[in-house]
Amino acid sequence: MQGRLSAWLVKHELVHRSLGFDYQGIETLQIKPEDWYSIAVISYVYGYNYLRSQCAYDVAPGGLLASVYHLTRIQYGVDQPEEVCIKVFAPRRNPRIPSVFWIWKSADFQERESYDMLGISYENHPRLKRILMPESWIGWPLRKDYIAPNFYEIQDAH
């Protein structure tokens, strides 16, 4: 069974993989990093005008990294907005995914946090730098193979 967006993407011969539906009936799609930006633009034009959230996670130690986007199609006069979840998997070594900042401005801090915690580089993001950790921090704290330092000196702001 396909959701509306998946059926539309198939009709227009756009590469993706349906991962089924979650417990709330929200369809989840897998998109390749190289196809993500064009499908993001198409999704926006199709009506997914709101990026509800973006997050990232480490799939497994030494495995892929995933960037997850929850998109919502909000229309005037429609009681129940349509939602879709899109997962973009990137290799652990040099993970690069196109930024959707220029489509949905709400991706700004969310993509920066994913970069800061997992090291996913969001290409063409205007301010991709650490947001939670100090600039001098080495490594990506939410990766499953991350080894925390025994000591880290916190510098006073004064």
Swiss-Prot record:
Catalytic activity: a plastoquinone + NADH + (n+1) H(+)(in) = a plastoquinol + NAD(+) + n H(+)(out); a plastoquinone + NADPH + (n+1) H(+)(in) = a plastoquinol + NADP(+) + n H(+)(out)
GO cellular component: chloroplast thylakoid membrane
A molecular function (GO) term: quinone binding
Domain of life (superkingdom): Eukaryota
Key word Ubl conjugation present: no
Keywords (A to Z) from UniProt: Chloroplast, Membrane, NAD, NADP, Plastid, Plastoquinone, Quinone, Thylakoid, Translocase, Transport
Major location category of this protein: plastid
Locations listed in the record: Plastid, Chloroplast thylakoid membrane
Gene Ontology annotations of biological process type: photosynthesis, light reaction
One Pfam short name: Complex1_30kDa
Known EC number: 7.1.1.-
Membrane topology, record value: Peripheral membrane protein
InterPro entries associated with the record: NADH_DH_suC, NADH_quin_OxRdtase_su_C/D-like, NADH_UbQ_OxRdtase_30kDa_su, NADH_UbQ_OxRdtase_CS
The keyword Nuclease is annotated on this UniProt entry: no
Similarity-based family: Belongs to the complex I 30 kDa subunit family.
PANTHER family: NADH DEHYDROGENASE [UBIQUINONE] IRON-SULFUR PROTEIN 3, MITOCHONDRIAL (PTHR10884:SF14), NADH DEHYDROGENASE UBIQUINONE IRON-SULFUR PROTEIN 3 (PTHR10884)
Function summary: NDH shuttles electrons from NAD(P)H:plastoquinone, via FMN and iron-sulfur (Fe-S) centers, to quinones in the photosynthetic chain and possibly in a chloroplast respiratory chain. The immediate electron acceptor for the enzyme in this species is believed to be plastoquinone. Couples the redox reaction to proton translocation, and thus conserves the redox energy in a proton gradient.
Subunit structure, as described in the record: NDH is composed of at least 16 different subunits, 5 of which are encoded in the nucleus.
Name the record gives this protein: NAD(P)H-quinone oxidoreductase subunit J, chloroplastic
